């Protein structure tokens, strides 16, 4: 649905990825612009579950228009998707709703759960695992395994780290952010929170991923440079994520 970093691409959306398995639909992240993109491919009521990796606005902001749609245009008869939030996500979302003075039931529009990152969960036919990764707020990478054993691992937003290498070992598809251009960007008290394309490629190579895809990079960057840097790190071709791109795992 969208691959943009915090500043959305022109005509694009922030983080949002639709995963389907055996008629079950899960939306992974729901950043700015994702809900509009979602409506181009399916009814909002067709989504069975929404999984949020961390509580940065470019990964959850469109839960607000999503909730409005479920509360009003689709009415009380609409099925409520499961909303799987990271630890502390329910309280933060409730505070945001209160501060904005939103008059519709954002939390009540969904079946809200906070997932235990240390546990293995199921969502329909999908098996979910989580791994905390270094970012500016607490963030969890996730693995979605299908009924036939295919594994899709999403690194969320993170700096290079060994924990994700171990977590993603031999995955079928590893999708990693490539936010930084060519050199690390350090902020928030010397904490690094993102990767370059080369970092992402190297992490995918170390993990032994069968395929690697790069996401969360700006349209201000030259996509061919992003690709070449990622491939230099991975040692094999990489995919550049864009709206409408489909993978089979």
What are these regions (language model features)?
Residues 1-43, 140-156, 173:
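Conserved beta-strand hairpin/beta-sheet module of binuclear metal-dependent hydrolase folds
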Residues 22, 47, 76-79, 148-150, ...:
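Short, surface-exposed connector motifs at secondary-structure boundaries
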Residues 113-170:
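Catalytic core of the metallo-beta-lactamase
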Residues 42-45, 79, 108, 124, ...:
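Structured loop/turn residues at beta-strand edges in well-structured enzyme cores
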Residues 75-81, 89-112:
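Active-site neighborhood of divalent metal-dependent phosphoester bond hydrolases
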Residues 33-82:
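Active-site metal-binding motif and surrounding structural segment of the metallo-beta-lactamase
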Residues 27-31, 48-55, 86, 152-156, ...:
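Active-site neighborhood of phospho(di)ester-bond hydrolases with catalytic His/Asp-centered motifs
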Residues 159-246:
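Cap/insert and terminal regions of metallo-dependent hydrolase folds
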